[in-house]
């Protein structure tokens, strides 16, 4: 059923379909599902905000963590905080009421925040892939990834993300409630007159999904070949090679995590766009949409788990300047420090 600013995946033969901005949508699924949805969003908020804020705070507090590579990783934390503060709180509040109680303004805010966070994350991973390719493969001789390059990379991620998320706010496509009608996203569902949804969805998928993915896969394809060649030729010291491998491994795991979280949502959205008129239930889009939102917690978790230097700094911050585990980490830290001086970036 299509309304002026909404689309509900249900034929209105019974006459019970109501605007998701004005009435509870309990006729779509059991009311308990909305309670579960609200609890899930609360979980993401109480985990996502502290770990991303801690990532931001610890990196800014410890000077040795302020490396060019970490600028991009900080950008990921900022993007996740946008999702948590601007999107998750709105969705949780809507789930508690069973409909989008904040109206179209809240829908635009939630859809914009969630999409912006996802786009910044994807383009940040593309920039990280380029950085890894340039540092490891050395297509440009004597090139060092410095602070100016990192700032340019961060600026690029925001420019591209805003180029994708602002148009629906000004009339090229739109944000509408989706799934159980408690979260909002791009209108993949309708051919509403005056919004040009078809052209925007094609633009979004090709320019803001396929292009960064092609960049990522190209860079890591070349990188894997270069790593094998360097290992065979022993062109660099073992310490340098180990440092670069650890950084690369962390970034690749971040890419895999992004794909695991967002690829189901993108696939379902593309299916709905290319099969408009097909029958599907409210959970068909709700499950992948809320699975994608979990991406806000995996990046800092990966960073904390795989970066010993950051982990030591975080423990020092949490224990008011002291690290009770310093003796256990001393050997690993000294190795990491040595690798940092040998590598052109700070190893993770």
Curated annotation (Swiss-Prot):
Residues in the Extracellular compartment per record: 1-33, 94-107, 171-199, 272-283
**Entry superkingdom:** Eukaryota
Give the disulfide map.
107-184
Tell me where the sequence motif 'Ionic lock' involved in activated form stabilization sits in this chain: 131-133
Q: How is it modified after translation?
A: Phosphorylated on some or all of the serine and threonine residues present in the C-terminal region. Contains one covalently linked retinal chromophore.
Q: Which residues are glycosylated?
A: 12, 197
Q: Which GO terms describe its molecular function?
A: 11-cis retinal binding; G protein-coupled photoreceptor activity
* Bilayer topology term: Multi-pass membrane protein
One of the GO biological process terms = absorption of visible light
Transmembrane segment boundaries: 34-58, 71-93, 108-130, 150-170, 200-221, 250-271, 284-305
Keyword Isomerase included in the entry's annotation: no
Question: What exactly does this protein do?
Answer: Photoreceptor required for image-forming vision at low light intensity. While most salt water fish species use retinal as chromophore, most freshwater fish use 3-dehydroretinal, or a mixture of retinal and 3-dehydroretinal. Light-induced isomerization of 11-cis to all-trans retinal triggers a conformational change that activates signaling via G-proteins. Subsequent receptor phosphorylation mediates displacement of the bound G-protein alpha subunit by arrestin and terminates signaling.
Provide the protein name. Rhodopsin
Provenance organism: Sargocentron punctatissimum (Speckled squirrelfish)
